């Protein structure tokens, strides 16, 4: 009787491990994805000739969607607006999140090729005019 009980426990444990492994999902490849920078501008209320007013790096939250709108992942850039994220090859949409009405940025479709990183530059509009 004890041997039969041990076999049931072992079977239940193996089933648990298999189900847990299945729930973890497919790991993202490490040799393809997206990388780039995020900036916000304009930063000066009135642009003047010979007075530089470059866009500034912007720490943003970005969401990657499938072309049908399903969320793949969400991540945050570093304080200098830089990011590098692993993704499987395919077609996606990058949705820049906005904490308020401004700054805002448009969705950006992109493609990831096998074994390559796609470079993206995202520009948020500050709303300053």
Predicted regions: what is each one?
Residues 36, 77-85:
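Glycine-centered loop-to-beta-strand initiation motif
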Residues 40-68:
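Short, ordered, surface-exposed loop/turn motifs in non-cytosolic proteins
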Residues 2-13:
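Bacterial N-terminal signal peptides that target proteins for export
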Residues 67-80:
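Short, acidic Ser/Thr/Gly-rich low-complexity loop/linker segments typical of extracellular
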Residues 24-27:
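Bacterial signal peptide processing site
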Residues 90-100:
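A short, solvent-exposed beta-strand micro-motif common in secreted/extracellular proteins
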Residues 99-125:
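Structured interaction patches on ligand/partner-binding surfaces of diverse proteins
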